[in-house]
């Protein structure tokens, strides 16, 4: 039961049977379109970003598994807010504001890569990154919003 692993960088939601994917997995004899469809389905939320993808192929049965990595949290935040870079002085210079819904969207994208085991903790991790980037959440300091999350202010949003 030999397994072959192919690691490539794909534009989110835009995998094609052409390069770089085709030449990498073509020789393995698996159905190219099934692989492309699965990659595009799993990377749709990362449209416009380069996403690391790992394709693990069982060379005996021709079964495959697609594992999608995630871009760094800072890249997801900057993409969501259309920013070029974070603040040079995040303690004093606030450069943007992000909504709690956007924070939750990013937490859902990154959930498998985060240390959190629920969305309440995941959004707090994302807000921690906002602190270091000079980004407010709902017009407030992210640390204040983290306390509100602890108090249950956003429970309706986080359980939906």
Swiss-Prot record:
Q: Keywords assigned by UniProt?
A: Ribonucleoprotein, Ribosomal protein, RNA-binding, rRNA-binding
Q: Which domain of life is it from?
A: Archaea
According to its UniProt entry, the protein's GO biological process terms are: translation
What does the entry list under GO cellular component? large ribosomal subunit
GO molecular function list: large ribosomal subunit rRNA binding; structural constituent of ribosome
Q: Which InterPro entries does the annotation name? A: Ribosomal_uL11, Ribosomal_uL11_C, Ribosomal_uL11_C_sf, Ribosomal_uL11_CS, Ribosomal_uL11_N, Ribosomal_uL11_N_sf
List the CDD domains hit by this protein, alphabetically. Ribosomal_L11
**Any Pfam family:** Ribosomal_L11
Q: Coiled-coil regions in this chain?
A: none
Assigned protein family: Belongs to the universal ribosomal protein uL11 family.
PANTHER family according to UniProt: 60S RIBOSOMAL PROTEIN L12, LARGE RIBOSOMAL SUBUNIT PROTEIN UL11M
Assembly behavior? Part of the ribosomal stalk of the 50S ribosomal subunit. Interacts with L10 and the large rRNA to form the base of the stalk. L10 forms an elongated spine to which L12 dimers bind in a sequential fashion forming a multimeric L10(L12)X complex.
Functional description taken from the UniProt entry: Forms part of the ribosomal stalk which helps the ribosome interact with GTP-bound translation factors.
The name this protein goes by in its record: Large ribosomal subunit protein uL11
Q: What species was this sequence derived from?
A: Methanothermobacter thermautotrophicus (strain ATCC 29096 / DSM 1053 / JCM 10044 / NBRC 100330 / Delta H) (Methanobacterium thermoautotrophicum)
């Amino acid at each position: 039961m030999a397994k072959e692993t192919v690691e490539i960088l794909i534009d989110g939601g835009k995998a094609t049977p052409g390069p770089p994917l085709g030449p990498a997995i073509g020789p393995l004899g698996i159905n190219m379109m099934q692989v492309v469809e699965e990659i595009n389905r799993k990377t749709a939320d990362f449209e416009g970003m380069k996403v690391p993808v790992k394709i693990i192929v069982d060379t005996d049965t021709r079964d495959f598994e697609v594992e999608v990595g995630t871009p760094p949290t800072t890249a997801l935040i900057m993409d969501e807010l259309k920013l070029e870079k974070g603040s040079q002085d995040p303690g004093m210079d606030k450069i943007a504001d992000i909504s709690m819904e956007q924070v939750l969207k990013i937490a859902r994208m990154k959930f498998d890569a985060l240390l959190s085991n629920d969305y309440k903790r995941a959004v707090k991790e994302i807000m921690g990154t906002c602190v270091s980037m000079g980004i407010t959440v709902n017009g407030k300091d992210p640390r204040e919003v983290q306390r509100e999350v602890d108090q249950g202010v956003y429970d309706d949003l986080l359980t939906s």
